Amino acid sequence: MEDRRAEKSCEQACESLKRQDYEMALKHCTEALLSLGQYSMADFTGPCPLEIERIKIESLLYRIASFLQLKNYVQADEDCRHVLGEGLAKGEDAFRAVLCCMQLKGKLQPVSTILAKSLTGESLNGMVTKDLTRLKTLLSETETATSNALSGYHVEDLDEGSCNGWHFRPPPRGITSSEEYTLCKRFLEQGICRYGAQCTSAHSQEELAEWQKRYASRLIKLKQQNENKQLSGSYMETLIEKWMNSLSPEKVLSECIEGVKVEHNPDLSVTVSTKKSHQTWTFALTCKPARMLYRVALLYDAHRPHFSIIAISAGDSTTQVSQEVPENCQEWIGGKMAQNGLDHYVYKVGIAFNTEIFGTFRQTIVFDFGLEPVLMQRVMIDAASTEDLEYLMHAKQQLVTTAKRWDSSSKTIIDFEPNETTDLEKSLLIRYQIPLSADQLFTQSVLDKSLTKSNYQSRLHDLLYIEEIAQYKEISKFNLKVQLQILASFMLTGVSGGAKYAQNGQLFGRFKLTETLSEDTLAGRLVMTKVNAVYLLPVPKQKLVQTQGTKEKVYEATIEEKTKEYIFLRLSRECCEELNLRPDCDTQVELQFQLNRLPLCEMHYALDRIKDNGVLFPDISMTPTIPWSPNRQWDEQLDPRLNAKQKEAVLAITTPLAIQLPPVLIIGPYGTGKTFTLAQAVKHILQQQETRILICTHSNSAADLYIKDYLHPYVEAGNPQARPLRVYFRNRWVKTVHPVVHQYCLISSAHSTFQMPQKEDILKHRVVVVTLNTSQYLCQLDLEPGFFTHILLDEAAQAMECETIMPLALATQNTRIVLAGDHMQLSPFVYSEFARERNLHVSLLDRLYEHYPAEFPCRILLCENYRSHEAIINYTSELFYEGKLMASGKQPAHKDFYPLTFFTARGEDVQEKNSTAFYNNAEVFEVVERVEELRRKWPVAWGKLDDGSIGVVTPYADQVFRIRAELRKKRLSDVNVERVLNVQGKQFRVLFLSTVRTRHTCKHKQTPIKKKEQLLEDSTEDLDYGFLSNYKLLNTAITRAQSLVAVVGDPIALCSIGRCRKFWERFIALCHENSSLHGITFEQIKAQLEALELKKTYVLNPLAPEFIPRALRLQHSGSTNKQQQSPPKGKSLHHTQNDHFQNDGIVQPNPSVLIGNPIRAYTPPPPLGPHPNLGKSPSPVQRIDPHTGTSILYVPAVYGGNVVMSVPLPVPWTGYQGRFAVDPRIITHQAAMAYNMNLLQTHGRGSPIPYGLGHHPPVTIGQPQNQHQEKDQHEQNRNGKSDTNNSGPEINKIRTPEKKPTEPKQVDLESNPQNRSPESRPSVVYPSTKFPRKDNLNPRHINLPLPAPHAQYAIPNRHFHPLPQLPRPPFPIPQQHTLLNQQQNNLPEQPNQIPPQPNQVVQQQSQLNQQPQQPPPQLSPAYQAGPNNAFFNSAVAHRPQSPPAEAVIPEQQPPPMLQEGHSPLRAIAQPGPILPSHLNSFIDENPSGLPIGEALDRIHGSVALETLRQQQARFQQWSEHHAFLSQGSAPYPHHHHPHLQHLPQPPLGLHQPPVRADWKLTSSAEDEVETTYSRFQDLIRELSHRDQSETRELAEMPPPQSRLLQYRQVQSRSPPAVPSPPSSTDHSSHFSNFNDNSRDIEVASNPAFPQRLPPQIFNSPFSLPSEHLAPPPLKYLAPDGAWTFANLQQNHLMGPGFPYGLPPLPHRPPQNPFVQIQNHQHAIGQEPFHPLSSRTVSSSSLPSLEEYEPRGPGRPLYQRRISSSSVQPCSEEVSTPQDSLAQCKELQDHSNQSSFNFSSPESWVNTTSSTPYQNIPCNGSSRTAQPRELIAPPKTVKPPEDQLKSENLEVSSSFNYSVLQHLGQFPPLMPNKQIAESANSSSPQSSAGGKPAMSYASALRAPPKPRPPPEQAKKSSDPLSLFQELSLGSSSGSNGFYSYFK
């Protein structure tokens, strides 16, 4: 029995402790320890060593608790040292495991509580409590971690944990791929993480690996569940799967079927205005002849709880018999009714809907009569008010425009007189001018990783300049046209009230502010805080004719006052006289705000004043000692209200100056008494001799508080030495200052202004109180450093470090510096994303907090909060303050609402046009309703209900306006509604949080941030998702509340998106535990999260566009040329049934783009015609996942189980044909075509791809890709902001500034036979992606073939899976060239139009049928006959210079510079990408380039026509694949065989005319180029001044950062063209361990690969740099899903097998080079082609695996590797260098028009209409960017000599690099001279051979020198021009990517 004694004693000790019998507990502990002592020798009867260790630790902990309670502190401390020493010596993990075990059994709580109480009370007899504090921290960390694990979210994890032994924290929710888990950069680098256990990134490689394992194990479980389910699949799932797999989906499900008439009541789309609503629909189905109804079922899962079948009756029109329907019925099975020979039969079906929350709900009902198609009907209900917020419309009265800044070059500026700027201020403004060149800003210090002692000044100077440019840019967005009321005087009410009178001929002007300029918007905040002058331009009644050479006058006016509603201006005498202004009249003026540069100049000045920055980088190697004595601790003069921690702080501050201390940090959240503590310390310091105190605060109100509440009463009590001097800003209006404070200020005798202090004034006072801004006055008084002995900075966390150091210029090493603040509150706002990345916004307090070790004595946390309820404190303590806070105040709670309460609203967040903000109407109504309810139930204990009682906080201005408006309607205007930024320092009895964001627009990152590059906090993502990702924002908001925090939001989104999801998990779990989770159950949240993560067949897209077979689509587009449109503004997206469910419920999209948040232009496809029957084969199931925001596509049964594939949801309105990524294995299923697979929309963040089931992860081939595209697309579409090419005045809005509106010519497109190719219409409707956002880059799509069906034969180390190849004969040469010549010489001349950007999308369909011609007879609706053969022969080879899919341009006329008769350059209609039939759609997202699948729609042969006839019925919709499948004999380009080069073969590429810098210009064009160019603020491109007058709104231009993004994404990764592929073209040659032979043998001998010959397809045809030689990690080569049709061969195109009797797709043989020589023109870029190969199809094509390097918001450009880019300006595969030269010569001969005979018929589609001019580089998308290999080639790879020669020839002959710079491209990474040489020399030496001319960093710093235009303008020195040169992104406008180049 003895071996159980110790354990028993330990248990008894625990019981005694809980009973508070401490002496007995002590006794039992001692017994247990003594018992354990005897087991120290090897005793086989005793417990095992681990058990001994556990009992020992437990007993010691109980002993410590008992000793503390018995006040035996010394013994407790000794035991504590013992437990820590032993526990940690044996490994911290083991020790923590014991603690976790105790916590799970509930044994840790009593110990932890006692420890916390002991340490937060009085100091333990003055002893040092370092060990006890450390133990307490360990215990609280353990409790936090364990409680998170137990919070209910990870029940399944705990289950797994018990069996699989998981050791780390549970992973974050909402992850849809194990690749999304990341490592926490901050933790790895600094060993601490602000998020603690709540961090969504792993804190070690081991934790990361475990998370990935857990994810995999959950996926396996899901797969098993699916396999089990498959045996007994439900009717609904079977039906959906059948529909998905059907060749003719409309034959499976349809909205109308023959012989059944459907009537419904009410409308299918209903809006209800109350939250608690009930709705029923009755469907009457009249069957003639009579038929049996077998089933009625509801299909859509996500909203199932809200819908049910309530009644079914059957009979004739007069008598109905009710059928039995179970309760909450989801599927009713009938078939038992007798029809008694009736000729007709009527069924009535009742569907009920119930909701108690606001939101949008959808359902699909199917009625199965035993025949197909099955009838379906879709219903939608919107539980939200749809009233327009009229006042918001009213707010649009202020016309906000973007225009050129007014400066002395464009206007005559009349300065305001008298000018009150002091000489010192003038000198500062002059001294700190923004440097004029980039290399002065981008110094090494800015590019350094962090702030150091050595780079301190230079780095902060540069970042301040960069921030100034960003502020300037933000403020430049506003020209306001306003009615200015002229006043002679005005009155202000309130505390700061008083009257002001104009004197000396001056007048006041007043104008009203609207939401546009309130503190709630970014720019508004800037205007309210950083602007003190405006330029004013009178708007004349009639437009005056301006004479040449005269400049308009603008007048400077100063801002006199800013109130919440008005701004008051002071107008100068000269202005009033010249404009003849009179009081009490109105005049219309245009205003431009002028940034006040002075505060930034003062920060520069402060930086230069800091002589010794050692104070700012304290040495922490030696721990300082703060002397302690009982006399000091219990000094009677200390205020008795001070708690222990506050006393500790006072002791540290008042430590004798002889003892040097680093800056003392007093950390504490609001409500812990920081100001009180500092004030007590001041009183104490004044008792020491020779001390002088400087108190600095961030705000005037806080400074006044010291005087009013502390110093004034102290002076009045008889302490004259404490008399403070309050220094105020000299222009502050005296009347606005509190009377008590007046007596401590220096006020001029006239009592009108404050005076600047003189040195004597300072010497007279021992206490000086200033704000950080006014502290600079003291610096100007020549006070010697060290004059103040103590410098106390309050609110130190709210100021940037540059502001905080102003007063520190007066400090020395001996000065006692104290910083008080809350490091977890919001940091100051910085407008420049670049500066934010480099931590310009971080406060000194924040930086030192991280610099000091955890238990540093100068880092004191005040931990008793007196303001909030205990539940609120405990939550914030646990999550934000390491468990150290405790509630000391007694705040009453509400009887009905627990202090943490959650109200569910399932709305959708929307972004308005011209707004960077979001709103969510469902939340607006929920908040208002709950506010009303709370007011009715206001407890007496909460006191009077007044203005400060209820606060509503949200991160977005738009939501603020909407909630205010709704409250106003309910007469609840006393409720405070604010943005979080504006509530710091305020407090409310009740606080409502509206979180706004949902998965509707927040797409979770689909790719990992590069490991170890986890986003840094305060990155763009934080700003972007508000409460979902910025923990400081969340903490700031929650800590405002005293008794109740009520959150209104979408719980699924909160728990699955953003870096705060674990904080929200905990919040919702607490609400659940306390029964305060309303509107959804905890179980539902868990189920939906699991469904979301594991991609069950849970949700399908309710907004799914209707399926129209391709053939019908073509007919329809022929019958209408209506534009696709978005829902009207101000109207609910789901307002009518038409909007939602009919394919022509269409409204015109508004082309305006967001101000400050540009998004991409997007062109919808043509709508379908007016034949409802033909066009109506709508999607039967709602296919949007409400949680991920993605659409979901069922995968056919070959996968086993109802696996679902996520596909992007491009547009949430009707009539838009969906673009879905389809797995190639279901290409055989017509359902794929139902989704218009060839028009595949790029994936975005929101489309998780379930490659987990044995498919390739997103990094399969590792290609960067536009991750943000779909997000933008989604936002844009959702708001109807689609940029369509509207003719008329709106056309201007979608052009870049230099594009003037053109009148599109009406062209008879049908007259060109090529235009009638089946794909020419749908193929061009690609959304442009040239408006990037700030998301991470994603790996690009690569068309990866499916792996072998037998995983066991998978070949390791193989980058690309082998493919079968069959030889295939070449085609005869088509006779199309004459026609082409005719077309290509047909460019219309358009003056005034500069080459268009690839930012928009070609809108060919809209014109395709404008002048219809009688079509020739067709083979099938999908394949038109006749001259269309040209289409089948169209070229499809690698097209090096074609822009990516998204880069196609809306119809625009060709540039003016290329006159019709003289230019060899031709516009090319973009045969739009038929987006990749992704060979594995489980690969990643966003193929931004010309997709590989494009091949499928353009290689068609004459042989194909015959096959088409045979296959017509089956393959009507397969236009792009048919020719392949039927063995059309399009030739493939072959490998290098010089003897075959002469063969005339049809082209396989669309020839792209290269951009030439020296285009032949017409006279008018030349004039235009002569004009000097200035930069335009949001554009990187330049435009001439004459064009600027007509620019569109700045907000609508592509943001500067777009260049950087495309720089990574869009540059082609192949090196320049080579004469013919050298030996390195062998695709296996990249991998050292493979050669062709080995591969052949290996594959050929493998029974699993019967037909697999060496595939020459996937590897790029050039040598890879050495770093890319490694094979990919094994995880990227996961085996694919098994192919289940054993008797069918698996073929790469049709998926594993193709059952339709078509032969397998042949591949090109590896021999025979293929070079086209036709009309003296060599084919461009004949790279080896395979329709599914990943050709270098666009400039964004093929980086190698290693180059996959997405950039997160926190990932600056210069940290990324240089990737290759392509220059294929002239000819890629020319037979000889001479040919190359000849061809390039032709390029330079501008009059030689005949030399450009393009051989691709497709290339001239629609020539005479305005077509894209493809080679114009814009925003980084140029094809002509110089290859990185030429600039800085990888050292290890030397291309073969012939390749180098060819590269050089090409580049040198035809490519002038300056055009890139001139047109807004990136600078070369070598000096211009060198480029010129390489561009004009014809020496065989390639630049690739040389060393890199310039490092990347130096390229960043080097000022790029553009090719000067004929007359180079003098560089403008104003900040805006400079901004455009640097094109830095500002946080709101550019959202985060900036280019560092010109």
UniProtKB/Swiss-Prot annotation:
Q: Which domain of life is it from?
A: Eukaryota
Q: Where is this motif: DEAA box?
A: 794-797
* UniProt-recorded Gene Ontology molecular function terms: ATP binding; helicase activity; hydrolase activity; RNA binding; zinc ion binding
Q: Does the keyword Cell division apply?
A: no
Q: Which residues carry this modification: Phosphothreonine?
A: 1163
Per UniProt, the ranges with Polar residues bias are: 1117-1127, 1761-1779, 1792-1825
Tell me the protein's name: Probable helicase with zinc finger domain
> What is the organism of origin for this protein?
Homo sapiens (Human)
